[in-house]
């Protein structure tokens, strides 16, 4: 896209996330050797340079970019020599970030529902009509999906277009999600589960075969 458009400036601006949960902290890419899909701005810029494009613009929260017909002006909220500090000392930066937000994160998780609701009935009422409208997507998913949570296993029957209890039915996909988080996502009627749940990495998953874009699209 950059080559086709011929952009004078390329701004990496979609991440990376910061995983501050203690059990997810290892998902942060710190040394570059981690099994992570979340590189930072500096890695993006290096990749651009390897490809022969020096138009990438370094940015951090608060960076302002002014674009005119003759120039691209970048103004950072800190001195230029401080811009790379979070990246050059990433472990210490993230550990401090985690400590600063620990109480807020604990308070936020405490807002998740503690009571159990009838998730199967709620999801069937919500998703049943959507599944009925999407026969081609259901066929493309190609199998059932199990959602395991505390005290409950839910089966999304894409072939039949219903949400029912899981009782050993054949399936190609499985998610395990903590009940309070799942209850919160369902209660809010989250339209895009990728942003509301999956990008947080607060779940585990299993699949048979290749990644299926259609299943992901259903949750979006």
Please place each PLM-identified region on the residue numbering:
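Cap/insert and terminal regions of metallo-dependent hydrolase folds
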Residues: 1-52
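Acidic carboxylate-rich catalytic motifs and surrounding loops in phosphoryl-/glycosyl-chemistry enzymes
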Residues: 13-17, 54-65
